[in-house]
């Protein structure tokens, strides 16, 4: 059975059709409308910083558990940093075949540092990556919102000091 599945994947690759990480034992692929629906890169590319941050943290855990050497971890971190730098510089790193930000980052990393790039996926699922990315994203946005709140409070305080003692019309509602 493994030979048959490998042969089908080989044939699909030769024909130029797309094979995704979730294809496997099925003889035919998903309907194109479902494939289009499941691709989220255009939406979750905004999570690139969080995805890379999560991968760096996960890599550290792999080093601590003895799965990854410190030298390999450094290569992975350098590769991830170069991806983020290129993304911020406006370089288009993505391909149409990239289903989501996780697969896109892993693909680019593997292209840059070789098979070592695939090790970053060891011991975690895409669901783990999605949850981590969203938690980091929300933490970052909450920090930004707190900074804006502080700025607003400082502005209100400055205005209160500037206009202290001045009359100001106030209404609880319009009637």
Give residue spans per PLM region:
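A helix-coil-helix interface module used to build multimeric assemblies
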Residues: 2-175
